[in-house]
Amino acid sequence: MDVGLKLAAKVDAVDIAYFETEIEPLLDHPLVEFIGEIGETQKSEFLGNARALLFPIDWPEPFGLVMIEAMSAGTPVIAWPNGSVPEVIADGVSGRIVDSIDAAAGAARQVAHMDRRKVRAEFERRFTAERMAVAHIAAYRLLLARASAPTRALSRRRWACRH
């Protein structure tokens, strides 16, 4: 099964040389298309119509918002296990975590059979704004409880010494 590759990206000035030497030669292939930079309104349609998002990050990406955006559209993610990828992608549920180009090619065939509703459900279970807000509030409450616990104990001791 031949699968096309559509590249959507902004090419910053610092990346032009890399783009010209590494990416442009690939654009001669009939299955490779460079879309360029896309806006927020185009992104939802682009990701929603994609078979998968290929996220070949090779550095410790702290989060990778585009993975979440793809999952919100029900689009599985194929990504290397760097940075936040293992925390964001539920391997076999919302995508595949791979460690090579060959594994990514195999994963592209596998994710074609993934239930996009389950990908979306994984997003809703873990990454909606409401879910993340609830998790943040719980974390803040835990931190506040830990921070104030020694203070309360110290205050009780001082009060007991005065009386």
Summary of predicted features, one role per range:
Residues 7-9, 20-45, 52:
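Nucleotide-activated donor-binding/catalytic signature segment of Leloir-type glycosyltransferases, i.e.
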Residues 48-62, 75:
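Acidic donor-binding loop of glycosyltransferase active sites
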Residues 64-67, 85:
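Short glycine/serine-rich donor-binding loops of glycosyltransferases
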Residues 72, 76-79, 89:
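Short hydrophobic beta-strand element within catalytic cores of glycosyltransferases
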Residues 107-122, 142-150:
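Conserved donor-nucleotide binding/catalytic region of nucleotide-linked donor-dependent transferases
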Residues 113-129, 135, 154:
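A short, well-ordered alpha-helix in the C-terminal region of glycosyltransferases
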Residues 129-163:
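C-terminal alpha-helical cap of glycosyltransferases
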